[in-house]
Structures are given as structure tokens and as C-alpha cells.
């Protein structure tokens, strides 16, 4: 399904709910709202976090589906209930205290007025500056054993230790293959006790740093370390995950640090269990609030937030009618 053009006379700028971000969380939230007979529009910049991946995994009924196909199906389902997707980038928002609407401005100058705003703009993965790493990201370079682990089973896996998450990753991937090697790229990533523990578990620890990934005909074959080249079929690395949303920043919601053993490993926007933020009428769901959430978790979060937004509007409407 093709995305709708920017706002026109047939697409009113006033809607019940505006969703910023057309990934699994955003489309799920919008579909719940559309099925509740709410006018809902999704503004999508077209930059899904998992675009580089070959397929989506650990999502019941959708295993192996290319990310783009999953989103295309989601847009089609949303359209069935009258919801719309428009291409655009939301860059500003105003949510005045006590007001009954939130106003969002897009990069093309279009403006939307909504009773509630749901931000599901996801997060960005910042990778270590190692030549070849970004080019293989989502294919031979992975981070999640539940998203990509089965695909690298029994292969030679190198864990690039750049943060405390490497210890966790090494253990999880050792369940999938006996050929796990940890390369200490950042000396602060692992403690002496961590290294001793890995070696006691039979996981080889090699001193880095990694200077580059080695490929042949576009396929990963190894990583270069100070003493030579380690053969590798896959590299595991923990990206620094950061929620970025100018819309949330504009209304006063700044990302908060997430720490692991005293080191900041991600930043996300605080929200409660149903996606409610501290700013009235502004909600958030998916990776923007939970950087580690897989696709199915992000979709579930969007569904839950969409349901809560609808319930909130029902109560608002009832209160208005009772007030006469």
C-alpha cells in the first residue's frame, strides 16, 4: 500500500489522535484507535530501525517476514478501518497546559491538531567506529540472540566487547554455538572477574581492539585484531540505543539514561506502563520508551497505549456530556 500524500482538502488537519512514527508500535496503536472509530493519522518518516534486517523473528505468525512487508501489511490493515499514513517528519509540537489539543508541525510545514499525541518514533542504534561494522549491520553483525540467534547457530561468532552488555551477549550466544570468542574492544567493557568467568566457561577471550571487519565478496569472513585475523561468520555487538524525538523534546520530555553496571548503555523517554508521559495528552510507546524491546514487544506496547488513549477519550467525552 502506498503512503498517502501530505495533508490536502480531503485529509483534515484536525484528528482525534496523531501518531508520530509508523513502525510496529505506531501502526498497532493507530489500528486499535481506528477500530474504536477514532479519526487517526500516522506521520511516518520512513526510517524503520530494523530496515537492514532480512526478516522479523520471535513474532508469532510472522516469522521471517521482511520488515518492510510487515509494515506494508500493517498499513493495509489500518486503512481497512479508516486510519491513514502520511509521509513526513514531525519536528515540533506544542502541548499547552490545560489545553484540549496538541499541535504538531512537520518538516514540510504541515500542521496537525489532535486531542492526543502518541509518539512511537523508535530509537537509533549507534555502532562503534569500526570499519565494515555498519555495512554488515542487520546481516552478519547482530545484537539480539532472540532476533537473529537461530540464524547464526553453530557458526563462528565473535562478540565485540564495547560495553558491559558483552558479558550477557556472550552467555546467550554460547547457547546457540560452541564457537564463541569475545574480543575486548573497550578495555573498560569487562572486568578481570568477567574475563576469568568467561574463560572458565570455555569462552575464549582475545585482547582487541578490532581494527576492521574482513569480508570476501560482501560476506563476513573475520575480524582483524592486533595479533592477526580471527575467523568469524558473525559479529555480535551492543549498539548504543538512543531514543530521538524532536516532538517529545519540544513538549519538555527529555531522554533519560539507562545504565548497566554503572555505564550508560541507552537513553529512552520515561513513560508509565501504558505509555502515559508526564505531559498531559502526550503518550509514547515502543523503542522510544523501551530501547531493548523486540518487534513483537513494540507492537504489543502500541496496542496497549492505543487502547488506553481511546479509554481516556471516552472518559473525556462522558465528562463533557455530563457537564452539560
Residue ranges and their predicted role:
Residues 135-151, 241-296:
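FAD-site-proximal beta/loop scaffold in flavoenzymes
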Residues 35, 39, 45-47, 54-80, ...:
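N-terminal glycine-rich dinucleotide-binding loop that anchors FAD/FMN and/or NAD(P) in oxidoreductases
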Residues 21, 120-122, 127-129, 160, ...:
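Short, well-ordered coil/turn residues at beta-beta hairpins
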Residues 1-17, 85-155, 222, 234, ...:
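FAD-binding core/adjacent interface of flavoenzyme oxidoreductases
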Residues 9, 15-69, 155, 165-188:
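Beta1-alpha1 glycine-rich phosphate/pyrophosphate-binding loop at the start
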Residues 29-31, 167-169, 285-324:
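A conserved FAD-binding loop/helix module that cradles the flavin
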Residues 72-106, 111-114, 177-268, 311-324:
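A Rossmann-like FAD-binding core segment of flavoenzymes
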Residues 139-146, 156-169, 190-192:
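Active-site glycine-rich loop that binds ribose-phosphate moieties when present
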Amino acid at each position: 500500500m502506498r503512503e498517502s500524500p501530505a495533508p490536502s482538502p480531503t485529509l483534515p488537519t484536525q484528528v482525534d489522535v496523531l501518531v508520530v512514527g509508523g513502525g510496529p508500535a505506531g501502526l498497532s496503536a493507530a489500528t486499535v484507535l481506528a477500530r474504536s472509530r477514532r479519526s487517526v493519522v500516522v506521520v511516518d518518516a520512513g526510517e524503520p530501525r530494523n530496515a537492514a534486517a532480512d526478516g522479523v523473528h520471535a513474532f508469532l505468525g510472522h516469522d521471517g517476514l521482511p520488515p518492510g512487508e510487515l509494515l506494508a501489511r500493517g498499513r493495509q490493515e489500518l486503512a481497512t478501518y479508516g486510519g491513514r499514513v502520511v509521509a513526513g517528519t514531525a519536528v515540533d509540537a506544542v502541548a499547552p497546559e490545560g489545553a484540549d489539543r496538541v499541535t504538531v508541525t512537520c518538516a514540510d510545514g504541515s500542521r496537525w491538531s489532535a486531542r492526543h499525541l502518541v509518539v512511537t518514533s523508535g530509537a537509533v542504534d549507534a555502532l562503534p567506529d569500526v570499519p565494515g561494522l555498519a555495512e554488515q549491520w542487520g546481516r552478519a553483525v547482530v545484537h539480539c540472540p532472540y532476533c537473529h540467534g537461530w540464524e547464526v547457530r553453530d557458526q563462528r561468532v565473535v562478540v565485540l566487547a564495547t560495553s558491559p552488555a558483552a558479558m550477557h551477549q556472550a552467555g546467550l550466544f554460547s547457547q546457540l554455538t560452541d564457537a564463541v570468542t569475545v574480543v575486548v574492544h573497550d578495555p573498560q567493557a569487562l572486568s578481570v572477574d568477567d574475563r576469568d568467568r568467561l574463560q572458565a566457561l570455555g569462552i575464549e577471550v582475545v585482547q582487541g581492539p578490532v581494527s576492521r571487519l574482513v569480508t570476501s565478496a560482501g560476506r563476513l569472513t573475520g575480524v582483524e585484531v592486533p595479533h592477526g585475523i580471527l575467523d568469524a561468520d558473525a559479529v555480535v555487538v551492543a549498539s548504543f540505543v538512543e531514543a530521538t524525538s524532536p516532538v517529545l523534546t519540544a513538549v519538555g520530555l527529555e531522554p533519560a539514561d539507562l545504565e548497566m553496571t554503572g555505564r550508560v548503555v541507552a537513553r529512552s523517554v520515561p513513560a508509565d506502563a501504558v505509555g502515559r508521559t508526564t505531559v498531559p495528552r502526550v503518550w509514547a510507546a515502543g523503542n522510544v520508551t523501551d530501547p531493548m524491546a523486540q518487534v513483537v514487544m513494540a507492537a504489543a506496547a502500541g496496542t496497549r497505549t492505543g487502547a488506553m488513549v481511546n479509554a481516556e477519550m471516552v472518559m473525556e467525552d462522558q465528562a463533557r456530556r455530563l457537564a452539560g
